[in-house]
Amino acid sequence: MPVPAKAFQRWLQGIAPDASTADVCRVSGIKRTTLAQQLVRGKVAEGTVVSISRAYNVSPVAALATFEAYRELAGPPRLPTHAELVSQISTPDLMRAVLARPAMASAENHVMDPPPLSAAPHATSVKNWVDAIDDGEVRHRVSAATGIAPQNYSAQLTANRLSPELAVATSLAAGVGPTGGLVAAGLITEAEAGWPPGARQAALDSLSDGDLTALAGDRLQALGRVLRRHEQDQAKTEMIWENLG
């Protein structure tokens, strides 16, 4: 939910009282037309708040927490669960980790340390995150709390996106820290959410060979289903064009 323009202007006055709109846009990298349009509409995007916060060395989480819609972000950060951390490891990183385990190394090949994990978010980070915290009823609770239709919520997950409002609502519905979904959706970084340095790597290292291999297998199966649907859709499209001559 975008923040009200009036509340945004009060907040901006508090962190940059002497800065002009041109100054703010220049240091934050936001186009002046973009900010002007948001102010005219009376709704300022959360991404705008985050970009300006970073430019003025203000915590994006603390900045968002000053707005009523995101008051749940206030207070000391809550650590992510083990499942949340693992969900933010990309499938390629999981595969590299599997191959780097001693159990997978052949007699001819020495075990090599895998490269550092790629930064969150990744190609399926949003759906993986929701699946990691879902007890089977989270989607229903989010729909009841926000009014979003279940099919619309599922569509966002399939597209690997989640609005900040729904990300926080999902966290609350699952009983986890309120910033995990914002990391999964790419609005804020792990560090900005208060995640300890190296937390994802530590979570990965704690997985047994069996658990790691099973997780990588599940990810590959999910990827296979997506690719098959894409291939089927492409084949149908080509058939339609052929029938049209």
Where are the predicted features?
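A short, Lys/Arg-rich alpha-helix, primarily the initiator
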Residues: 1-21, 65-66, 80-139
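Short coil turns linking two alpha-helices in DNA-binding domains
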Residues: 20, 31-33, 45, 59, ...
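Short alpha-helical "recognition helix" segments of helix-turn-helix
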Residues: 20-25, 52, 138-145, 170
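Core residues of bacterial helix-turn-helix
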Residues: 28-29, 56, 146, 174
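Recognition helix of helix-turn-helix/homeodomain-like DNA-binding domains
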Residues: 29-44, 145-162
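Short, solvent-exposed alpha-helical "recognition" segments
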Residues: 41-48, 71-75, 158-166, 190-191
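DNA major-groove recognition helix of helix-turn-helix/homeodomain DNA-binding modules
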Residues: 46-63, 165-181
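Short, charged recognition helix plus adjacent turn
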Residues: 65-104, 184-231, 240
